[in-house]
Amino acid sequence: MQGNPSLLAVHRTVYRARVHRHDRRLPTRIAPWLTLALIAGCGDDGAQPTGPATSDTLTTVPGTMSGPQPSSSTGATGDDPHVTTGANTTNPDGPKFDVGKMDLGSSDTEDCGGPVSPDATLTGTVYAPNLYLPISGALVYVTTGPVEPPPDAVYCAECVELDCSTPSTFTRPDGSFSLPAVSGPNQKLVIQKGQFLRVVDLAIPAGDTALPATTTTLPGRWDPPAGMWIPRIAVYNTSPDKVKNVLAKFGMGAINDNGALIEGTENFTLIPDLSGSFLENLAEMNKYHIIFVPCAATKYWPEAPDVPPARLANVQAYVAAGGKWYATDHSNEYIEQPFPDYQEFHSPFMPDIQPAYDSNGTVVDPDLLAWLQALPPNLKDIGGGYPNLNALPGITTRLNYSGIDTISPIIVQDMEGKDVDVGHHPWVEGPCGSCSDPQMIRPMAVTGQYGCGRMMYSTFENSSDNHPGLSPQELVLLYMILEIGVCFDEKPPPPPG
């Protein structure tokens, strides 16, 4: 199939590929250099869903739902018991998921095997599993073929093409979408963001259909028989940076009235923070798509602030194989020592800053900014004396315990021998009031690429205490989690060095 050269951009890296304007790119393959790595193997605010009204013309394919059923004890997971779900996952040649960032073009089907005239339009809003937080940049498409799920372990998420005749679109910053489609039975609605994937069997009537939020919501649990997949996540069960609460408020667990995770309901793995022994078993690490090492998790480990050589090598191998690695403030050694060339911390021999400082920063990533601006008022300001988002791009981050002096370009060669910068991308910047130059604007939340994986770091804690609703820095964390899960538009280059 012929097409015009298109530019595909992922953060600061721009790739060139020949892509017809109706091709869609979704992940599948594993880079050859990954083989050895794989073998070695720190609430809900009461808002109600604001999704579109349900059309009474939508029909579902007769069938039954199998697998675990929704339960009020595990929190809202966006599950609709009236919609039958499921995906044929046995055919590796069917449309795959996920796309990077690219322009999907118009509904023209030139060079696509003949004209297809849409006679139906599906509209709706994609929400987080909590049914109220909109999801920006989610892929929505309709297919009659099988859908390949994400592997149940770490993998290299390289994009592949989705057939140009497949109706597809991305959600807007407010999570909404409008998808022209062809009416008929036995179709699948696919909604995907990173490793969050939902497949819903439905019959599409002619005309306009507003899909209910319970149909268009990302799943909150791993339940393949019900057409639901989520990233496998491991998070250290520590305090005060309670990332577990943020994940629960996203919809991956039940929360109490104070916005705290009700332990036992989580759809992720809690790792005891008594030691770093989990990081000494690469095979165990490779079971997870994302690993969180929050602030206080490492602070009292016997070897702190050093990272033992075997543990350091495991972190590098895990990320190179496609893992997503996240650390915050006091756990900075788990970014600095495995990836020393990517950033320079303030006072590098003692990067843990006291006293902690608040920072009046700025959101510098345009897509993150657009999403925050599109949030409804009750999500921009949760009250209780917490910072709000009413002065964007300004954002106040609380309890920063480190400072980054610089982030550096990291130049590697792609598969064509061309230079590619895989260094950190800044999302939020601001001054460090406890640093020697308190007026200097510094990166405060960053993500970088290392082989097939990505690492992210923030100088601030994300969830220091139990509280209802999602604070600005918790929202930034969730957006970054979703964005680092998307696939690579080109085969990722090997790690630097």
Name each model-derived stretch:
Residues Y357-N466:
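Catalytic beta-strand/loop cores that center a nucleophilic Ser/Cys/Thr
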